[in-house]
């Protein structure tokens, strides 16, 4: 990436990296550190044409093992919607780079 002065690095965080929660200190510590790493890398690599972004995934993700409850259709994140967010970040023009993005299900409080 450095020789080409182009590239994208995406780091996946969680809401625990933005807000501390009871009984989550070890997890939060790692996610807070990841967010700090993303911010430092973004400032270091931005002048060299490399886009670094931190994505906060704030909610559960639907899967075959964890289907969306029929009575709560918007309670879990759709993995395809998350993938679309990552793809959008990869394709962003340099004139409008995002440094941090939060994705959460529609019913999630913030």
Residue spans for each PLM region:
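Catalytic loop of short-chain dehydrogenase/reductase
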Residues: 2, 8-33, 38-39, 43-46, ...
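Short beta-strand segments at enzyme active-site cores
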Residues: 7-11, 52-55
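A generic alpha-to-beta junction signature in SAM-dependent methyltransferases
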Residues: 1-3, 93
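C-terminal helical subdomain
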Residues: 47-62, 68-110
């Amino acid at each position: 990436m450095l020789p080409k002065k182009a590239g994208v690095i995406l780091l996946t965080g969680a809401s625990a990296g933005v807000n501390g929660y009871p009984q989550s200190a070890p997890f939060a510590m790692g996610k807070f550190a990841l967010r700090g790493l993303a911010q430092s890398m973004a400032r270091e690599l931005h002048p060299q044409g490399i886009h670094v972004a931190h994505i906060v995934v704030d909610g559960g993700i639907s899967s075959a093992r964890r289907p969306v409850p029929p009575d709560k259709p918007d309670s879990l994140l759709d993995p395809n919607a998350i993938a679309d967010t990552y793809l959008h970040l990869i394709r962003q023009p340099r004139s409008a780079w995002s440094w941090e993005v939060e994705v959460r299900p529609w019913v999630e409080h913030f």
